[in-house]
Amino acid sequence: MHSEPENCVIEGDLTCLIPATEAHLPLLADWFTDPEFVRNWGGQPLTREEVAAKYTGRRRPDVESFLILAQTVPVGYVQYAPAGPGQGGIDMVLLPQAQGKGLGPDAARALVRHLHTVLGWTQVTVDPEASNTHAIRAWAKAGLRPVGRQGSHLLMECLPAHSVSPTEIHDEGFPPRA
């Protein structure tokens, strides 16, 4: 493990997730106005007002928003939204310079583990662009598997193993290998 900030609420091996707040608006606004950052997040840069409304925690409890930190350095954003009892979806985006270092899969594993074990979710879904092979590989490393397509998106999900208690779920959402 590594040194974590005091406000780390979901901890991975390489990352920790902290709730996004209004105090993070300058950072988030810089990120979400950068065409490279949003290339795989809707593709269009957002205004500061849109970022404030969507990504600083104003939509809680409908959408929970987090900064992803590597050590104490912000490297990305992740959110989850319930879609029904025991299920919901995750969206995540990393800074281009943070990609390819295992940070995305680590943050995703930590969040999936939290959703399964703390919140009792039985189904976690993501929907990356089918052309975004980098994201698809990262989600697969986090334990999500393709289950279908919806338009230009690949639907992936992670189900906890049947007949395994939430405390026995391995990082990828499946029981540990023997």
Model regions: which residues?
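Conserved GNAT acetyl-CoA-binding A-motif
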Residues: T117-D127
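Short acidic N-proximal helix/loop "leader" segments that mark the beginning
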Residues: M1-E11
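Acetyl-CoA-dependent GNAT
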Residues: E22, R39-Q99, H114, L119, ...
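Conserved acetyl-CoA-binding loop-helix of GNAT-fold acetyltransferases
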Residues: G100-H114, I136-K141
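Conserved beta-strand-loop-alpha-helix junction that forms the acyl-donor binding cleft
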Residues: T125-I136, H153
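Hydrophobic alpha-helical core bundles mediating ligand binding, dimerization, or RNAP-core interactions
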Residues: L28-T33, V51, Y55
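A short beta-loop-alpha structural element at the N-terminal edge
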Residues: T15-D30
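Conserved acetyl-CoA-binding loop of GNAT-fold acetyltransferases
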Residues: A140-Q150
